[in-house]
Amino acid sequence: MHNKSYKKAVVFAICLTMLMPLGSMVVSSTDESSSQADSSAAVKDTDSSVDSAADDTSSADASDAAATADESSDEAAEDSAADEKTTTTASKDDEVQPITDEEALAMCEKITESDKIALYLDEENERLCLYVKASGKYWWTSPINVQADQTIIDTVKGTAMKNAQRKQIAASAAIRVGDLRQEKRTESPAPVYSNKAKVKWEKNSDGVVATYNYVSDGVKLKIHYVLEDDNLYVYCDSDEIEEKNTSQVDGKVLTKIEFCPNFGAADSTATGYMIVPDGSGAVINYNNGKTEYADYNQQVFGRDYTAVPITAPRTTQQAYMPVLATVSGSSGLVCVASDGESNVYAHAQVCGQEKQAYNTCYFEFETRSSDSFFMSGDNSNKITVFEKNGIKTERFGVRYYPVDSDNGEDLNYADCAEVYRNYLINNKGLTAKAQANKSDLYVDLYGGVMKDTSILGIPFNLKTEITGFDQASDILDILKDGGVDNITVNYNDWTNDSIKNKISTEVSPSGKLGGSSAFDKLISKDDNMKIVPSMNNFKMDSGSWGYMTLTSTAIRVSNAYSRQSSYSPAFGVAEKGVSPALLTPNKYSNVFTEMLESYTDEKLTSIGFGDYSTKLVSDYSKKDPSSRSKTMNTVVDGYKSASEKISTVFADGANSYVLPYVTNVSNVPVYSSGFNVTDFDIPFYQMVIHGYVDYASTPINKSSNSDETFLLSLASGSQIHYDMTYADADTLQDTEYDDLYYSNYAGWTDLAANQYKKVSSILSGVSDYTITKYELSDDKNVLTTTYSKDGASDVVISVDKKNATATVGTEVYDLADCIEGGLTE
């Protein structure tokens, strides 16, 4: 009995001894979780280093991972303690005191300088300064007082930023990585900032080079900070990026890079705004209080159409220019993504968003694309795959241009637009092609479409005339009789192949529309009527010689063919049926060559390439891959060749990289997407190109508010644009043209003529001027645009949306006859 009791006591003691470390672990784990919870409260916080270490399964990295975990655990504890000190009973004496720009500069070393600007480095604080000599303005790559900032972020708790958030804001770079393990297959949900990396600085005569070693993520890269005459050029070459383990079994790959995400960040006391490239352009005021909304995040040049979304993508305007700006008072910083711009996202956020206290805008580069699909039809089993075989883009780069007003007044939106226009002139070859005293009415005409028809009870899919060549001529005659002196016509779907949605590269007018003789007659109709026979070879319903769907369809990252889905308007899911094949960009060169040969042989002087000017795609085939960057260069080469052989190169919308090579651009938006975080729209795109490229608005009759679209077009210096068809709406029903239900010419020719005559009298005199100032009244109803030209007096045009008038100098134009239904307040 005694022995049994003794044995029970020993067993109990052993069990208790074994449980004690477990209890300690539970307490430790709870503390660590609390610390990590505080860290994750900050936006875009990195994964905990313990997780990172656990994720790194390589035995060779075990010691590094363990060391990183220990360091990060200690850091998390310090952060938690610092946060507790910051947000509870810390006295004023214990708080970090703010410093001035001059005091911050005293901690820096001058690296290099030009006649206009100087570059300084504060290596200890991982911070650079761009100093503008003329204005004395300091631009810091991260806020100098981030540690002292006591702005209340959590209004419920009355607390300021967490310490982890402060460290992220002070970082000079950030990355995201893709986890290739089969059970993960995800991208890091938030950036990993450079405060989690080992950073080494090297100085040279042009600037500095920073090496960022993300040990736990297995990524090492170099970022160059080069001072040029009027800008700071920050770039990273892909051949200087090292990825330690890219194994598809247990590796990690670099997927995104951010340079200086808080360059020029403005604190909660600052007044100013940011410009984002959404649609026509939009303004985000500093500290606008929209903290509950998502920050601005948009892919420049639109999404990659090779990846086919599982559900319908949201309907937004496109960002056509890789440019951002932040402005305070008489100074601003214009940021241009100059390298790798085909794979960049524009970001902006205001104080209070994501639990941080600054207003900032920045670019995020995508180094690898990804794609998602579901296995076995199970919508819960989503698989993500990342682009293989290295980083295809050679360089990622941003240029930061400081700009100041000449007279000390507040910087205008047009001043920032001028910076980007000069960049296009000096770096991309943009030249002035706009004609003086010229105003055109832009009209899109649609030739033919396939339509299901029953003959003797047997269904046939037949070519159907929508606007034949003679009918197009009749529409133009009506417009001319109404007083329209100059017309630019974009004629769509006028060959048999284009009507059938096949690749069409030969000038072969469809007999269904009237044949070659009627086509030739239309083309040569009137010297003041510019007819552009366009071909859109972006996708195809079926193959043709040289462009078979089996060999000429773009391949997705997932190794599937890229078929462009149509989506249910009600549910947003892909509709069943045959989806058009996306033409591989490897065939674009053939398309450009064949079209140009055929157009020049037929002595046509105008050409258009449809979606090539606005949509960028990739091809991830193993044999001949094409990244978005390579596709962009192919498109640029094609448009450049066209500009050398054809006098009129027409763009149906235009990303910035084609602007140097086109003479006319239609479908220039007058709105942004209206993201909640933005405050109002501006015609930033128009400010960049006015006086250099002729352009027209989106179709007036397509807009849900045609009156406002007309007035905004006038205020932004845009020509008027209409969609027109000869056939009635019932003919368009159940065809690819059913969304043109509004376009029958009979209902629009009178209004179009009236609007053209009014716009021509107001704008033709400034057609070759640049926009040098744009102002909005407090209620946003009066829009005032200043046009300037060397050797001429400025012309100021004000458009009053509420009263439907336009004022040029002292002359007031009544726009009542240009308004279809009147405007409401």
Enumerate the predicted regions with their spans.
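N-terminal accessory beta-strand-rich subdomains and adjacent acidic, glycine-rich linkers
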Residues: 86-433, 701, 705, 819
